[in-house]
A protein has these predicted regions:
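Bacterial N-terminal signal peptides
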Residues: 16-27
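Residue-level detector of intrinsically disordered/flexible regions characterized by low predicted structural confidence
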Residues: 7-9, 18, 33
């Protein structure tokens, strides 16, 4: 069947029944979000020195966060201290969120009737899709990696380039994107208004006789604000200090000190919500992506991308805006080297748009064991 085949009313009942069956299975996955994610494991590859370093830090990290060893950032960059997230109510708590959950898993939002929000943001994959870049309408492949939707309730800006300023705005963009769901707002609203089930549910929630696009995005955003999962890191912050292995504890210490991770990844969501160039523009080459420059047209924005949250990072690979990094160890190696530092090729020496890697990325000189410890800690997040 072609992905562009028009929606047919004939098999709608059969398709909706199948969808409900899938929804029941997905509901089990969503319920799992209420429990902590599985532990990351034991001290794999933890050498005697690293384990000893971690054991020696037990007392230093036994007290409240404000009593932990001082944070070190590049150029004394301001940061927010680590903290627990404000947990949102479950989707079952509000009718709007329940309606948004139904829409999220329903391919009725797409032109082909075959692509749902969950196609690229699956609960079993930490609300990502686990591939380099997502595949959308008519098997088209996008340029960017699908970010997780977990813990987005308080996020101020969305998309790798900051194109969306709210969850509602973010929810609308994939629907109308010709590469993703390829549906027009007019066609979608007509479909929902003529669907007896959705027409009734929207009327019950909004009190209006007709569905508007703002109602659709409000429902999706309401559901997405409920998406969260507790992790091993949360349990540690809550006071279970024995939850971390010695290697993970040493990794936490490195994250806050020698590795300078808190320069950009701090606060309860472990991000500064800013835009930085870490050297992955691929200027003039395959995978070229100008990042935020496409929105601002400011030369300094070439190659800048939003700092992603590191929460749930163990389960959200492959990594970076283009999904070209399959492992956390590769990411740590990149930052250990001070980021990528591409040089202009002949003819590009005076190009005003040639991107410059951020000065916030010094070489770190982490040993192999230290990098292993840092990865072990990242896997607790």
């Amino acid at each position: 069947m072609s992905l562009t085949q028009p929606k047919s009313p004939a098999p709608a009942g059969i398709f909706r029944a199948a969808l409900l069956a899938v929804g029941c299975l997905l509901a089990v996955s969503c319920k799992a979000a209420e429990a902590p994610e599985p532990a990351s494991g034991a001290d794999l590859g933890c050498g005697p020195q690293v384990c000893a370093e971690g054991a020696a830090l037990r007392d230093a990290y036994a007290g409240p966060v404000e009593a932990w060893p001082a944070v070190e950032t590049t150029n004394d960059t301001p940061f927010e201290e680590m903290a627990l997230l404000d947990r949102p109510l479950a989707a079952e708590a509000t009718p709007m969120a329940r309606l948004g959950e139904a829409l999220f898993f329903d391919p009725i939002l797409s032109a082909s009737g075959q692509i749902a929000c969950a196609s690229c943001h699956h609960p079993d994959l930490a609300f990502t899709d686990g591939i380099r870049s997502s595949v959308g309408h008519d098997r088209q492949q996008g340029r960017r990696n699908a970010p997780t939707l977990l813990d987005k309730a308080d996020q101020p800006v969305f998309m790798w380039d900051g194109a969306a300023m709210s969850l509602e705005h973010q929810a609308m963009m994939p629907i109308s994107n010709p590469i993703e769901m390829a549906e027009t707002q007019a066609a979608l609203i007509e479909t929902l208004n003529t669907d007896p089930d959705y027409a009734k549910r929207f009327q019950q929630v909004t009190g209006e006789d007709t569905v508007a696009m703002a109602d659709v995005t409000a429902a999706l955003a309401a559901y997405e604000r409920t998406l969260t999962r507790r992790t091993k890191f949360d349990l540690f912050l809550e006071g279970d200090r024995d939850r971390f292995t010695d290697q993970e504890l040493f990794g936490l210490h490195l994250y806050r000190t020698k590795a300078r991770c808190m320069t950009c990844h701090s606060g309860s969501r472990l991000t500064d919500d800013e835009f930085h160039n870490i050297g992955l523009t691929y200027y003039g080459r395959k995978y070229e992506d100008f990042g935020r420059y496409a929105l601002t047209e400011e030369p300094d924005a070439v190659g800048e991308f939003k700092t992603p949250s590191l929460r749930h990072v163990r389960r959200t690979g492959p990594y970076m805006h283009n999904g070209l990094f399959p492992s956390l160890r590769g990411i740590v190696n990149l930052y250990n080297a001070g980021g990528a530092r591409p040089r202009p090729r002949p003819g590009m020496e005076n190009d005003p748009l040639f991107p410059e890697t951020s000065e916030l990325l010094p070489k770190l000189n982490l040993t192999s064991d230290e990098r292993d410890a840092l990865v072990a800690y990242l896997e607790t997040l």
